[in-house]
């Protein structure tokens, strides 16, 4: 085997390794995939993401307990804003969701999502 062939083989192996490790953790779904037994689906999604975002804010030195001093009206406005954000993000990503099969439903309902994946949906 020549040196250039050996180099090409090693480069190809490294490229495959990088691609696999970069994209190996992504969830891919199809519409007919069953929901994960521990998945978060339906109205629970917005509640869980809201809680996770508040936890993230507290971890980063934000409000110590954001839920403690948000009134009912404020909480409703936050929820509406969050749902609006999800809708906008869903519309923006609609084409890529159809192509790649990824998104909050795929990550958290069809699969069991992690705290880090939930945090990606905070604004």
From Swiss-Prot:
Disulfide bonds join 29-106, 41-109, 53-122, 108-113. One of its GO terms (biological process) is glucose metabolic process. The keyword Cell inner membrane does not apply. One of its GO terms (cellular component) is extracellular region. One of its GO terms (molecular function) is toxin activity. Coiled coil: none annotated. It is found in: Secreted. InterPro entries: Insulin-like, Insulin-like_sf, Insulin-rel_pep, Insulin_CS. PROSITE patterns: INSULIN (PS00262). It comes from the Eukaryota. The modification 4-hydroxyproline is found at residue 34. The modification 4-carboxyglutamate is found at residues 107, 117. The keyword Repeat does not apply. Residues 1-24 form the signal peptide. Residues 59-102 form a propeptide. Keywords: Carbohydrate metabolism, Cleavage on pair of basic residues, Disulfide bond, Gamma-carboxyglutamic acid, Glucose metabolism, Hormone, Hydroxylation, Secreted, Signal, Toxin. It holds the Pfam family Insulin. Expressed by the venom duct. This venom insulin facilitates prey capture by rapidly inducing hypoglycemic shock. Intraperitoneal injection of this peptide into zebrafish lowers blood glucose with the same potency than human insulin. In vivo, when applied to water, this peptide reduces overall locomotor activity of zebrafish larvae, observed as a significant decrease in the percentage of time spent swimming and movement frequency. Heterodimer of A and B chains; disulfide-linked. Belongs to the insulin family. This is Insulin-like peptide-1. It comes from Conus victoriae (Queen Victoria cone). The lineage of its organism: Eukaryota, Metazoa, Spiralia, Lophotrochozoa, Mollusca.
């Amino acid at each position: 085997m020549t040196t250039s062939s050996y180099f090409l083989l090693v480069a190809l192996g490294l490229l495959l390794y990088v691609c696999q490790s970069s994209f190996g953790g992504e969830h891919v779904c199809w519409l007919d995939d069953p929901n994960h037994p521990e998945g978060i689906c339906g109205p629970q999604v917005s509640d869980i993401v809201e809680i996770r975002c508040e936890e993230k804010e507290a971890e980063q030195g934000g409000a110590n307990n954001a839920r403690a001093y948000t009134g009912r009206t404020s909480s409703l406005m936050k929820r509406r804003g969050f749902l609006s954000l999800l809708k906008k993000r869903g519309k923006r990503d609609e084409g890529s969701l159809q192509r790649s099969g990824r998104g909050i439903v795929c990550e958290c309902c069809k699969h069991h999502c992690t705290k880090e994946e939930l945090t990606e949906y905070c604004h």
